[in-house]
Structures are given as C-alpha cells and as structure tokens.
Amino acid sequence: MKLIGAEPGMKAVMTRNSDHFVSLGGRVAIARRVKAHLLVSIHADAWVKSNVRGSSGFALSQKGATSAAARWLAKNQNESDLIGGVNIATVNKQVATVLVDMTSTWTIGYSLGLGAAVLDELRSINRLHKGKVEQAGFAVLKGQGIPSILVETAFISNPTEEQLLKNANHQQKLAQAILTGIKKQLAADKTLVEQG
C-alpha cells in the first residue's frame, strides 16, 4: 500500500484493515464505492500436495463476464455513470446489452494485459505455476467496468514458499513486482490514465 501511495496519481484502498471476513461481493462494492480504476486481489494459494508451487494470475472468463453482465444489468438498471455516464434505464434493452457487452469485452482484455504484465514481473521473483494468465469466474473479478486480477503470490501449502511469504524482504519484492506490472500495463494501454 505504501508503494502505491508513493506513486503520483495512484491511491490504494484496502478492502479490509484487520483480520475479518469481507464477502467477495463486498470487496467489489468497495471498489465501486471508491470508483476504483483497477482491482487487484492478492492471495496465497493452497493445495493438498505440498510440492505444488509458483505464482499465478487470474482474470475473469468471458463466460463469467456474461453472467456478471446479466446480474449487473438487472441490479443497476436505474443507475447512471456506470457505463460512460449512460443511464441504462433510459435506453432500450438491446442497446443496454450491447453497452454492457462492450464494457465487459474491454474490461476482460485490459485485465488480461494487466495480469500478463504482473506475471512477467513476478517471474523474476518466483517461478510461475502456469505460464500465462488463467481465466475463471471468480466473484471478486466481476466488478462491471473495473479491470480486475487475482494474484496468487505463492502456495502457502508449500513449506518453502510459506517461509518466503513470512519474510518481509520477500513480501516487499512481491509488492514491488505487482506495482511494476501495474505501471507497465498503465504505460502500455493509457485508457485508464486518460479517464483520470
């Protein structure tokens, strides 16, 4: 959080500041409330086999985005400013569906680029569990119009990686890698920078 706060034009907002549960939908709601331009969910993975290791990145799948778009449209049809300032309630359903689909397509594409940039940076610190950004229907990634990634820094179920995750120096390296990946994506695709 300190690294991001030191960057001009960037601000980090935590979804929680203590060890308490915040629902996945609650995390997305926080991102919407603060008008987040990006959502980066950072975790440690776990598996039944202790030899599994590596960092991973996830973005929303197209199937998940379509499902989220339908839920979003139903829940937010009376709100404006969620898609380019267009009040969805004032346009016909076909136009609304096209707007939501266009936003979903752009959001997923940006998220995939962001995930790839972050994984490229994490690769220098930890081996990758998979060589590319994977896609799945994680609820925390379903914030309509907010490019989102889920980063699995390592496997806490792997004793070696667990020790690394406890190390403050390693934590700093992970944080710096994630920030550098974010900055590289922002430089490569200035859409979010231009939105202010």
Predicted regions: what is each one?
Residues 38, 48, 99-196:
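Active-site-adjacent mobile loop/cap segments within catalytic or ligand-binding domains
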Residues 1-92, 104-116, 192-195:
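Catalytic-core regions of hydrolytic enzymes
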Residues 93-97:
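Exposed acidic/Ser/Thr-rich ligand/metal-binding surfaces
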